[in-house]
Amino acid sequence: FLPAVLRVAAKIVPTVFCAISKKC
């Protein structure tokens, strides 16, 4: 889609993964 969407996803995905895996 839009580059802006990819940027937001790039910030959200690691955060969500961090919260789920408990490994930051």
Curated annotation (Swiss-Prot):
Transmembrane segments: none
Keyword terms of this UniProt record: Amphibian defense peptide, Antibiotic, Antimicrobial, Disulfide bond, Secreted
Tissue: Expressed by the skin glands.
GO terms classed as biological process: defense response to bacterium
Cysteines engaged in disulfide bonds, as pairs: C18-C24
Coiled coil start-end: none
Localization in the cell: Secreted
Entry keyword annotation includes Secreted: yes
Lineage: superkingdom: Eukaryota
Keyword Secreted included in the entry's annotation: yes
GO cellular component terms, A-Z: extracellular region
Family statement drawn from the similarity comment of this UniProt entry: Belongs to the frog skin active peptide (FSAP) family. Brevinin subfamily.
Function: Has antibacterial activity against the Gram-positive bacterium S.aureus ATCC 25923 (MIC=3 uM) and the Gram-negative bacterium E.coli ATCC 25726 (MIC=24 uM).
Protein name: Brevinin-1HSa
